[in-house]
Amino acid sequence: VGLLAILAMVVVPLPPFVLDVLFTFNIALSIVVVMAVFYVARPLEFGVFPTVLLLATLLRLALNVASTRVVLMHGHQGTGAAGHVIESFGEFVIGGNYVVGVVVFVILTIVNFGVVTKGAGRISEVSARCTLDAMPGKPMAGGADLHAGRVTQDEARKRRAEVRAEAEFFGSMDGASKFVRGDATAGILILLINMIGGLAIGTLMHDMSLADAARNYALLTIGDGLVAQLPALLLSTAVALIVTRMSGEQDMGGEVARQLFGRPKALWIAAGL
């Protein structure tokens, strides 16, 4: 049902208030995913993360298409034509200076695409490869423990299932990270389409001056881009966190506090410096 709704968003024009609700839901979903990643002790505890990541990426792309349609069709009516969320993001970031808004959006895109997404994709690829390479040895070690009587048959079966689930998880993460990187690329192209197309439509079809068209469409375009890039950056961060997460007994906060602040000598030296 959710997938069909996402596909319908691409085809059916959405009113601005529906876009506001969906953009708010998208941001909230990204925050929930990041928080869930923080509180898992092992990556397999969030085994549905690749599926959630894929659905969230598809939702964001569908919202990009829907908002682009609204911006290009109704942008000449004013900065509130695409909803309050896009207008608020645009006004907050631009602050009366459109160059600043464009620069902020470009910086966020570079951070997301060139740093977080690229690094997370590389880590996912290496993790999947290392997990697959280690698969033959782990069942053999479990079989040796079973024959030696160190584990029961149920425990050996559970270990084999965990090895298989771990390989499937990191393999899925390797593929899902490609969707995230493609989404970041699509965000750049959508920004250019909205800006160039908006200026052309405003000046040629609605007899707006170049300054008025730039004011309306620049604000809507930058607001639309930021509303999409913020959840994308959060999900990219979640991908990077979960693929770099080592299995432990505590969540990420507990492990960081124990390992980073568990050595008083290092803290005293840092305080002295």
Give short role names for the model-derived ranges.
Residues L19, V34-L55, V65-G90, G114-S177, ...:
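Juxtamembrane helix-loop transition segments at the membrane interface in multi-pass membrane proteins
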Residues E166-I196, V227, R263-G272:
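Transmembrane alpha-helical segments and their cytosolic interface motifs
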